[in-house]
Amino acid sequence: MDSNTVSSFQDILMRMSKMQLGSSSEDLNGMITQFESLKLYRNSLGEAVMRMGDLHSLQSRNGKWREQLSQKFEEIRWLIEEVRHRLKITENSFEQITFMQALQLLLEVEQEIRTFSFQLI
């Protein structure tokens, strides 16, 4: 994984964990969990691409990797919508900056995962 992407994930996760969104803290914790899961999935796909011979290993380990890929894209879309919603309702500039960076990161990671998946197909 690109070192900038790693630091972006870590920075956004740290910033989100510091936010106090009142009654919606459960939602925020869910978003943080989704971000962490997405980070791990993106890393594993990237590693599989780096070892192109690993495609067969990936498919044999997880015969349903295409379904898993589809599920990850659904999670990304959900996170994008959730982040956009947060951007619309927040007036706190720290939160706005954090969610804008999170949105940018999600769009970049979605594109990277698409690129990786096409290389694996």
From Swiss-Prot:
GO terms for biological process: exit of virus from host cell nucleus through nuclear pore. It comes from Influenza A virus (strain A/Duck/England/1/1956 H11N6). It is found in: Virion; Host nucleus. Average number present in a viral particle is estimated to be 130-200 molecules. Gene3D superfamilies: 1.10.287.230, S15/NS1, RNA-binding. This is Nuclear export protein. It comes from the Viruses. The keyword Transport applies. A motif (Nuclear export signal) lies at residues 12-21, 85-94. Keywords: Host nucleus, Host-virus interaction, Transport, Virion. The keyword Coiled coil does not apply. InterPro entries: Flu_NS2. Belongs to the influenza viruses NEP family. Mediates the nuclear export of encapsidated genomic RNAs (ribonucleoproteins, RNPs). Acts as an adapter between viral RNPs complexes and the nuclear export machinery of the cell. Possesses no intrinsic RNA-binding activity, but includes a C-terminal M1-binding domain. This domain is believed to allow recognition of RNPs bound to the protein M1. Pfam families: Flu_NS2. The gene is NS. Transmembrane segments: none annotated. GO terms for cellular component: host cell nucleus; virion component.
